[in-house]
Amino acid sequence: NNFLQKKILNSYDNFRPDLVVMGHADKVTSLTLEKMKNFDKNLKISQWFLDPLSRHGPDHLNNTNRILDKIEFIDNTFLTTDPKALNIKMPNSLFIPNPCDPSFEILENFKKECSFDVFFAMSHGVHRGSLKRGKKDDREIFINNFIKKNKKIKFDVYGMNKVQPIWGDQFMKKISNSYMGLNLSRGKPIKYYSSDRIAQLIGNGLLTLIDHKTYLKDFFTDKELVFYNNLDDLSYKINKFNKDRYLGKKIAEAGQKKYLKYFNSTVVSDFMISRIFDIKSKNKFIWNKD
């Protein structure tokens, strides 16, 4: 680990940046950040964190320790959960949406006839290539009940029931075959949190269904996303839009248009920089009320 810290400090010394941004950089030590700050008192250090932080979610203690580990040297923290909904207090913490990128989100599923009705994918850890034996996830119970209730719906499901998770190009190939996508994250819903799957579902033009308890209605209307209250409501809406494909595709197209316009990586990065350096931006940040 000393070798890594030296490499980081050498890179810092070579470039002397005004800003260092870390994302899930667990191996960087507080001492390394302290040394950087000692080199340059005006240096800004920020972190972003995309994992769940709710006390009702998975890995709560571990994720909390990770985000607070170097907090004394962090000027700003950007989270994909509303900081006000958390029981962790972090100075200068702000919400950011999961960014999309038009060079990655390239599909327009609303323009075609898909062979599957509903897509859902999960895993037992970020980019973990295979299922963990004996590992259970609450989502499996929900999805299996959902499938049982809707025998006429064609599901394409990965990461459970002995079907391995999918990543990268394989993920894109599979997602291209579905009309609707279920966005269901681990743990109980919490304000604004979603895994980054939301960007892939909406951004690729799937009609996306999400729990209303995420409060994403603050940014999207019923003409852009489909919000459900419980399993029965989700079943009703899946069947409704499975029959009314014209309306479903219009909603999917409007959702993609908004996500690519307001939640793209350029706009999200600009928001971060504008808040870090207190600079006014010409962009509209629909998720920020300040």
Show which residues each predicted segment covers.
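Conserved acidic donor-binding segment of nucleotide-sugar-dependent glycosyltransferases
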Residues: L225-L231, K240-R245
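Surface-exposed amphipathic alpha-helices with a cationic face
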Residues: L33-K41, I147
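A short, histidine- and acid-enriched strand-loop-helix "catalytic/donor-clamping" loop
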Residues: S46-H60
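Catalytic phosphate/metal-binding cores of nucleic-acid and nucleotide-processing enzymes, i.e., regions
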Residues: L234
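Generic anion/oxyanion-binding catalytic loop in active/binding sites
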Residues: V163, I190, K223, D244, ...
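Nucleotide-sugar donor-binding catalytic core of glycosyltransferases
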Residues: F3-K7, S11-F15, G23-L31, H56-P58, ...
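C-terminal amphipathic helix plus adjacent low-complexity
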Residues: K237-D290
